[in-house]
């Protein structure tokens, strides 16, 4: 009889979602990924997750599946299993995701803030092994942190102890969480594009152009993907944007370390 433990991991992000089937030995047996498409509402992504689960149930023996873990940006309530209006998931208001997945699979299901989930995983299986204190940053559509303090996950009263994206690094600057100059405003996928938009508008206002934006009409079309491709090709204007973000990342990390 097999003694292997099998699990499903579900990650719900503002840009993409993922569903994996694996073991507690870090063997990933199946992995699915798809765009979240927040403009289509929460149940588009939820239905896609259900489709992935149905495929997995046909492919593997679910009697050996111990449980399902869901990782999602906060705020959320890990005790009730409800997603509570995350900034990067517009329309995901009071979504009982744990109950939905339980009904679809009849398996124990749990949810945790994405940054906390990542911190736990890295602490147990990755670069954080052997350390009593670990900070893990989620640098995606938004920015958050998971905290391992004195050998335990520190989630705080409402699972939001690591929401460092709110830290203000400058009185003015790109917005994150609708707060100008915030850590997330400078250091996130959406924030990097905002830095570029600000720099481009400053140049256009004095009659100059940047490689990634030659007119005011192009300002809102600037994307982080576009900038990363240019930066990888050595474009100086795009590299300047990433340098600004990188310096703020270092500054933000120094604040967390001091705390």
Where are these regions (language model features)?
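A charged helix-plus-loop insertion that forms the helical arch/lid used to bind
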Residues: 82-92
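Structural signature of FAD isoalloxazine-binding scaffolds in flavoprotein oxidoreductases
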Residues: 160-164
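ATP-binding/phosphotransfer module of carbohydrate and carboxylate kinases, centering on a glycine-rich
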Residues: 1-67, 77-82, 98-108, 121-131, ...
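Short hydrophobic alpha-helix segments
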Residues: 32-34, 87, 157
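Short, active-site-adjacent cap segments at secondary-structure transitions
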Residues: 75-78, 117-119, 144
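Adenylate-forming
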Residues: 118-124, 147, 166-168
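Short beta-strand segments
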Residues: 11, 69-73, 136-142, 146-148
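General beta-strand structural signal in soluble alpha/beta enzymes
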Residues: 109-113
